[in-house]
């Protein structure tokens, strides 16, 4: 086992990273930030998302585990005072894992160039100013012409993030699906959209094709990647063949995560 430590930039997380490195060394576990088999993130969910982006080329070999140093994270299963217990669990690791779908994103520009991204949670496309007008294709078929602030495409694990904030459904990650949620769509007697989030089968794809206009600067996001782009021709979304893998021995069940994150404790009647 080779372990990488990926921490947030705040002083507390940096210190927790140093403490963890010391405990790992004491237990003769190799620290390797270049070619790890386990990546331990220290911080919050944002830190874990950044770590996935850093190790995209190693997703087949790497499993992730999160230590949260602030508020309870959706992806982080351990607290900073449990480092000794975490290392003991690593030493007895049997290779068990739980995997979640990844979003594959292909951006085509007006000059014909392509850029690909992957996301654990979601991707959004919004117009920087004014109403975004875009054709939405499901597969090769035109589904609707959208007018509004933008669109959010999420994975099942990402369904609890921004997707939930814009009224999308929460989806269990064992369902390897895409979800498209509208961001402030325009619906009246002249302009209509479906007005609800759409959940796609694993083999279906979504393409957003903005209608050309004078003001065509778009805000594109993929997890923590946030870009302004003036040359977007279309954005194509699908479920990626790869998955992101997490250590299983302390991995909280999905619906327990949802309850802990959004509801909290419940007094039984």
Curated annotation (Swiss-Prot):
Transmembrane segments: none annotated. NAD(+) binds at residues 45-46, 121-122, 147, 149, 160-165, 184. Gene3D superfamilies: Probable inorganic polyphosphate/atp-NAD kinase, domain 1, Probable inorganic polyphosphate/atp-NAD kinase, domain 2. It catalyses: NAD(+) + ATP = ADP + NADP(+) + H(+). Its EC number is 2.7.1.23. Keywords: ATP-binding, Cytoplasm, Kinase, NAD, NADP, Nucleotide-binding, Transferase. One of its GO terms (molecular function) is ATP binding. Pfam families: NAD_kinase (PF01513), NAD_kinase_C (PF20143). It is found in: Cytoplasm. GO terms for cellular component: cytoplasm. The active site is at 45 (proton acceptor). GO terms for biological process: NAD metabolic process; NADP biosynthetic process. Its main location: cytoplasm. Its cofactor is a divalent metal cation. It is an enzyme of class 2 (transferase). Involved in the regulation of the intracellular balance of NAD and NADP, and is a key enzyme in the biosynthesis of NADP. Catalyzes specifically the phosphorylation on 2'-hydroxyl of the adenosine moiety of NAD to yield NADP. Belongs to the NAD kinase family. This is NAD kinase. It comes from Pediococcus pentosaceus (strain ATCC 25745 / CCUG 21536 / LMG 10740 / 183-1w). The gene is nadK.
